[in-house]
Amino acid sequence: AGHYETQIGDFLALLKKEPDFRRLVIFGAPGSGKTTLMRYLSLMYANQTPHELHPKAPQFIPVLLYLREEYPKILKNPVLLEDFLPQWVAELQKSKPLKTPPGWFAQQLREQRCLILLDGLDEVADERDRQRLRDWVDEQMYEYPETPFILTSRPAGYTEKAELKQDAVVLEVEPLDSEQIREFIRNWYLALETKKQGGQTDLGVQDDAAQQAQRLIAEIEQNPDLSEMASNPLLLTMIA
């Protein structure tokens, strides 16, 4: 398979018109930003702004399931998504449960209106449970062929009894490059200083943040071990 760099928006633009791209699996090391990416996609679609990722990205209703939290319920009663999601929605806000009209999710799923985001396909410790969860995901993809699915997994966890039987396009989250590391650090310190100053972003705050950022950037660029760690977003926040 060839290796080339692209943006997630390029794939979102193809979700409706290209059946081959309706099944995406996103690989990434722990802390590489897989869950953050899924949350970001969910937010962009919930705000009806996917065009910011790509001008041709179609609108969907996002459904983000954290499999590490949901898999016990799924395996206890492995029903179709159209039966699982109404109960899931009702439990999102227990103080004031949300109710969807009967058959609403079934209609949305069959009319290609939902984007199913499944985070952490590999995050089930028991091997048999992981296989059963994989089978359930496969069943949903088979049952709703028009509905796009995006899954995340660690590479090792995906091949160890979690690989899908359905054909999927596999993408990989790339490590941060040096310019992305610098931008991340600058934004990180600006956010910290702004919060520290009660939301103010005057020149003094910006200057303090810039000085702290520059010190860390210099330290990382002079230390190969730190530089390697900094390419992982989670480890970079720990260094900062």
Predicted regions and their residues:
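P-loop NTPase signaling cores
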Residues: 1-240
